[in-house]
């Protein structure tokens, strides 16, 4: 992230990260707090999580790599694992037709192999971040489920603020884009 913003010529920048991207954003805030104008973390806390994504990754890996499959067929196959059609549509944005057939743009094998590392969050203690820090949390089906998760964010970012969108889960930007946009605009104001 820092290499990219340096190449773009930004001294200070706002950083928004969802899920694993939120962990990356918190790590950037920890390593270069003076560079951030705003930090917005979406539905992930600075804690180690138990793995609940391997079944989803395995479901994605199990989808047919058949050039004859339509997007609708892939959507139907994925529906057994992901009931919400908006989330399926979001995931299917990463499923592309190539000359060799349908392929995932993300490296599912690497995700499956590295899941224990991705679920961890090894850094602890407060971050000396002068910039505003906001956690936009989903409701009970999101990753930020407990008071302990919220407290971990406030301990890491003592001047942090938490906004909860109780009617959405882990993908608030997909499940209720308008509410998410309002929370994000407020956090970046």
Where are the predicted features?
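Conserved alpha/beta-hydrolase catalytic His-Asp/Glu region
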Residues: 51, 66-123
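Conserved acidic catalytic loop of the alpha/beta-hydrolase fold
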Residues: 1-13
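Catalytic histidine-centered segment of alpha/beta-hydrolase-like enzymes
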Residues: 165-181
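Flexible "cap/lid" loop of the alpha/beta hydrolase fold
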Residues: 26-31, 35-69
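Conserved serine/cysteine hydrolase catalytic core
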Residues: 100-156, 161-164
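Gly/Ala-rich beta-loop-alpha elbow adjacent to hydrolase catalytic centers
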Residues: 17, 21, 25
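Short beta-strand immediately N-terminal to the catalytic nucleophile in serine-hydrolase-like folds
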Residues: 15-17, 42
